[in-house]
UniProtKB/Swiss-Prot annotation:
It comes from Arabidopsis thaliana. Part of the 50S ribosomal subunit. This is Large ribosomal subunit protein bL19cy. The keyword Nucleotide-binding does not apply. One of its GO terms (biological process) is translation. The keyword S-adenosyl-L-methionine does not apply. GO terms for cellular component: chloroplast; chloroplast envelope; chloroplast stroma; plastid; ribonucleoprotein complex; ribosome. Residues 1-70 form a transit peptide. Keywords: Chloroplast, Plastid, Ribonucleoprotein, Ribosomal protein, RNA-binding, rRNA-binding, Transit peptide. InterPro entries: Ribosomal_bL19, Ribosomal_bL19_sf, Translation_prot_SH3-like_sf. Its main location: plastid.
Length: 229
């Protein structure tokens, strides 16, 4: 009994200690889940931050990719435009060189000679030849001239015609003059080609000053205006 009486107070004295110990243990155990919950929250927040940072990084990467793609497209467009411009310039240079080469290869342009020019040259040469054979004096309207003409029907005898020059018709080698004279009271007009080979000599007797190029009015005037010694 003594032992039991001694044991009971000890047991009673030991019982509250165990609850305190248990309470301490419970306190530690209660602290541990709180720490674990805090750690879990921190881990969750870290995961969320990591996830958000990864999303933000992905957004930044996507923006950078878009900008890089846009820059690449711009660079490719600029390169294509530069290539097209270079191709156009090379084509223009090639065309210019081709035109220059074609112009150099072409023979020099020859001036076209018209039929009228040819006839003028022929008349000029014929006049030069006729003047070398027989010189022709300067004949003007109003001059009194003396012409020695060879008539084939008259056995090549020379006939002398004298008169006043009424007009002159310039036609190259076919230039003619019209001479007027009064014969037996009648006015006679004769046309002579001055470069004809049948005319052997043309001599200017005298010069008269007149105001007109053609003296056709002498037909209506008195015969004394058309007579001379």
């Amino acid at each position: 009994m003594a032992t039991s009486s001694h044991l009971l107070p000890q047991a009673l004295h030991m019982i509250p200690r165990t609850p305190s110990f248990s309470s301490k243990n419970l306190g530690v155990s209660s602290i541990l889940p709180r720490a674990s919950s805090v750690n879990s929250r921190l881990s969750v927040s870290r995961v969320f931050l990591n996830h958000s940072s990864s999303n933000f990084g992905f957004a930044i990467d996507s923006k950078k990719r878009k900008e890089f793609i846009a820059k690449a497209e711009e660079s490719t467009e600029g390169e294509t435009e530069a290539v097209v411009e270079n191709a156009v310039e090379t084509e223009a240079e090639g065309e210019g060189e081709a035109t220059v080469a074609a112009e150099e290869a072409k023979p020099p342009w020859k001036t076209r000679v018209k039929l009228g020019d040819i006839m003028g040259l022929l008349n000029k040469k014929a006049i030069e030849v006729a003047e070398t054979v027989r010189p022709v004096p300067g004949l003007r309207t109003g001059d009194i001239v003396e012409i020695k003409l060879e008539v084939p029907e008259n056995k090549r005898r020379l006939s002398i015609y004298k008169g006043i020059v009424m007009s002159r018709q310039n036609a190259g080698i076919h230039t003619t003059i019209r001479i007027r004279r009064i014969i037996a009271g009648i006015g006679v007009e004769i046309v002579f080609p001055i470069y004809s080979p049948n005319i052997k000599e043309i001599k200017v007797v005298s010069h008269r000053k007149v105001r007109r190029a053609r003296l056709y009015y002498l037909r209506d005037k008195l015969p004394r205006l058309s007579t001379f010694k």
